[in-house]
């Protein structure tokens, strides 16, 4: 939150506004703990994606994500325009290099990165379950085959 271009503009900050980042981290930690508690109490399955962490990683390691601009938006000056105020403003030539479309909203590329993280988060959990299920299935087949083999030896 503290790295949003509009926040940095309003706070006259060159760097991310740490207090808002701390609030986001604290909030997300509390959600993660509460979900853990609910999973245990209600025997439910949930997945949690800390979107703040995705933004933080993209801000700290822009090249890894293919960004060249993480401090301002593609629209207008990129520091104050939000939503409707972008209409009529000039935009950057290549939005895929930008993390933000305007001073608050991510670009389509950043939304795609977030979606891919969510799919991977859920997919990893499903893959693990599949691997466990598959391993148990193989163990059952081996056990069944061994029992048949042992039975055939006894019947001789």
Positions of PLM-derived features:
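Short, conserved phosphate/pyrophosphate- and ester-handling motifs at nucleotide-, phospho-/glycolipid
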Residues: 107
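A general structural signal for alpha-helical elements within enzymatic catalytic domains
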Residues: 36-39, 123
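Solvent-exposed, polar/charged alpha-helical surfaces in well-ordered, non-transmembrane soluble domains
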Residues: 25, 29-33, 112, 116
């Amino acid at each position: 939150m503290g790295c949003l271009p509009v926040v940095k503009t309003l706070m006259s900050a060159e760097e991310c506004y740490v207090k808002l980042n701390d609030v986001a981290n604290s909030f997300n930690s509390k959600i993660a703990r509460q979900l853990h508690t609910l999973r245990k109490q209600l025997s439910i399955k949930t997945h949690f994606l800390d979107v703040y962490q995705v933004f933080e990683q993209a801000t700290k390691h822009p090249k890894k994500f293919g960004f060249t601009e993480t401090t301002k938006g593609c629209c207008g000056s990129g520091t104050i325009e939000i939503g409707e105020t972008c209409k009529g403003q000039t935009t950057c030539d290549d939005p895929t290099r930008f993390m933000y479309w305007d001073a608050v909203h991510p670009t389509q590329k950043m939304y795609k990165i977030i979606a891919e993280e969510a799919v991977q988060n859920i997919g990893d959990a499903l893959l693990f379950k599949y691997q466990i299920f598959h391993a148990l299935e193989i163990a059952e087949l081996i056990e069944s085959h061994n029992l048949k083999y042992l039975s055939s030896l006894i019947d001789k």
